[in-house]
Every structure is written in structure tokens, then in C-alpha cells.
Swiss-Prot record:
GO cellular component terms listed in the entry, alphabetical order: cytosol
Classification via Gene3D superfamilies: Cysteine-tRNA ligase, C-terminal anti-codon recognition domain, HUPs
Gene name of the record: cysS
Residue numbers covered by motif 'HIGH' region: 30-40
Highest taxon above the source species: Bacteria
Catalytic class of the enzyme: ligase
Keywords, in A-Z order: Aminoacyl-tRNA synthetase, ATP-binding, Cytoplasm, Ligase, Metal-binding, Nucleotide-binding, Protein biosynthesis, Zinc
Residue ranges annotated as motif 'KMSKS' region: 267-271
Pfam family, one: tRNA-synt_1e
Binding residues annotated for ATP, in chain numbering: 270
Name of the featured protein: Cysteine--tRNA ligase
Amino acid sequence: MLKIFNSYTRLQEQLEVDKKKTINMYVCGITAYDFCHIGHGRTFIFFDVVVRYLRSLGYALKYVRNITDIDDKIIAASLKNNESYISLSNRMISNMKDDFSALNILPPDSEPRVTENISDIIKFISILLNKKHAYVACNGDIMFSVSSYLNYGALSNQFSKILNKEINISHYSTKKNIADFALWKTSKSSIFVGWNSPWGNGRPGWHIECSSMCRSAFKNKIDIHGGGVDLLFPHHENELAQSVCIDSNFSIKHWMHTGLVIINNEKMSKSLNNTLLLRDLLTQYDSEIIRFFLLSTHYRHPLYFCYKNLSNSSKLLKKLYLSLRGVDFDIKGLDIVDNFKTDFYKAMNSDFNTPLALSILLRLSKEINKFKLIDSNKASQLASKLRQLGSILGILLKDPEYFLQNNFNCNNSIIGKINSLIYERDKARRVKDWVRADRIRKELLELGIVLEDTSFNTFWRSLQ
């Protein structure tokens, strides 16, 4: 049975679903003010694997991933770029979709935008006001009253005296409590983006946006709510508080959070100017290499980025593709592959242990290489299973020859020379000119190319 670490209880818990095997999953998406970076890649590739795995188990999954298309950062960036917030957010959403498509991240079943949910947001704020969980600040903003929700802080475990400390209103004129946060921000100037509401022209606060979109998609039942660990507090803490205060029957069974990305021993952040954009990384590495690298660390652990580790992921993925070379991997697998499948699913059932799952794929590839020499039918059965299990992780989806040749670091003229030499060597072998055939093999070896002869073809691979 699948067990998931729940950020709320801090325990691994069994995923329990209804008789129809339906699962509702909501993941906080991007704020569309800049290009996506490797932190986005880590989070959304991981939840893409969750989607693929749950569906492979036969669950009827509904996956919703929102887009924040109005926000302080979006407004600031649009003013800096001298473009409308709509133009900026649409441009960044388009770039996100290009990046995610390149990384083979499956699109969600629904991708709601904040600006499409303003009426629902206003309705939910009104409910919070009527229930005395919110108040109108002296500047006209609508604030959530943290002290009205006794369980505040339980999700993130970030308790502090300051959360319940009444403060001097002259210092924080919009708040009764320093932890209170905005549900609705009233327009303060002509450049302020806003919508009409019972409280005047304004726009929603960040946290109420997700509460609204969650409830619109799933009502009161969410099985999995995910996002990066940087969202745990205050965003997810505040989101949960609002949602429960709107309706006490609201529940989220499992909270899941991906770990931080560390670059040069520092947390990756825009303030430190050390972000690595996905689009830049995709110009240097195949998308499957990036996926392999990001899945090589357990999703809850910090991921330490360095190019050496990316290169190592490239070598390991090439090993998997090399084992698929020269076999019929579309053949149906039989009993001999059951042990690998069992081990793979056991790893994934243990809180999505993708590093262990990848190691099982590498073990399977060694078995394929062994049977290539003694039993081609068994090799094909194993290769079929490798391809199938790899697809759950979003890898091994390409033609092996295409992948291996396109990830060999040289230009087309050198690849052409390699293929030409292999052709000349094949001609020499057909007329039993072994001296010439061996000379060409040595010439290719000097280029860093190793040949692999099979009964029906000759393949090459790089020593890089």
C-alpha cells in the first residue's frame, strides 16, 4: 500500500481513498511574473511523477494546478517592464507551458487562474466577515483575524509568541495582530489593479486565492495538497486557516512539500541572484537528463545543484538507453520481470522513493545486457518492463538511438564521419577484410567511440 509523508502530522500515512478510487489533488502553481527556475522544475516534475504513478495504480485522479496571474510581484514587474499586468502574466504563462512541455510535464486536468475566480473570492471573504473571522482595517483592507482560529500554526509548527501578541496599532495600522493577513487590498492609487467589491475597488490577497480555487474545484474534500516547502508558512498555513473558517467540514488528508534547491551552499532565491532558469538548463541538457537528476534526490530532502551531478545523471541515463539498444522493447513482459516490478512499486509506495526506484531501473538494465548475449527473448521482455517503469518517472520515452546520438557532445559533421566509418567497416566485414575493419574500429576508438556489434547491426556509443 502507498504511504505518504504528511507534513501536517509529520508521519508517513497510508493513502486511503473511496470505493471509486477517486483522488483529488491540488498543487500550488506559479506566480506568473518571471521565467520558471529549477525550483519550479523540481516541484512540478515530482508532482508529475505522483500523477503518473497514481494513474498507473488505477486511481481516478483529478489534478488541479492553479496559476496566480495577479499579485504584487506581477504588478511591480509589469510597471518595471512598462507593460500591462495581463500582457506580462500571459507571456510568462506561455513560457511556463513551453518549459513544462519540454520537460514532459503532463498538463493538469484543470489550471484555474486567480482573475477567473474573483467573484468566488469575494463571496468567501464575505463569509469570513459574517463569521467574525475577518475585519475591516482602518485603511479599508479586509484582514483575516488569526486569533479567531485556535488551531493556527498546527500545519507549519511555527509557533511564536508574536502570533498572538496584540500590537500597537500606530505601528501596524492595518492589523489587530501582527500575524493577521490581507484578504482584500483596496485600491490606493490610479495604477492599482482592482475589481469592484462590497468594500470598494481592490484585489484579493495571495492566500485567499488558493482557498477559493481549491473549494471551487473540490468543495470540501482534497486528498493531496502539494507545493514547495517554502509555501508551508505562511501560505499554506493561512490557506488552511481560511478554508476551515469558511466551512468547518473542509479537510485535506495529506499535505506534501518538496525540499529546497541549494546552489553553492545557499538556498536558491531571486534575492541572492542565484536562480537557474529552466530554459537555460534545457539548452545544455536533454529534458530526461534534467528529470533524472531532479528525481535522484528524495523529494523532501534539499537538492544540491551542481553540474557534476547533472553530468553523472547523464551517464546513468545513457546506461539505461544503451540497454534498450538492439532489443524489441515492445514485446510483452513475462514472469521473469515480476521481481523488478515488485521492487520498483515497493520503492514508490514508500513515500515516492524515486532515488531507490532509479537504482532498480539501473539494476534491470544490467540484467538486460546480460541476457542480450544468451537469450534475446528474455532481454526483450526485460527491456519492455524497463521502458514501462521508466515511463512512470517520465523517462525512457525516446528512441534509444535518437537519445544516444543527440546527447553525444559533438557537431553533425563528426556524427556523419562516425556513421560513414561504421558503414565502411561493415563493408570490410562483409568481404572478410578484418585488417581494415579493425583499423576503422581503432580509428573510431581514438575519437572516443566504442562499437557494439550485434547479429543484425552495429551500434556506437561515446566514452564521454
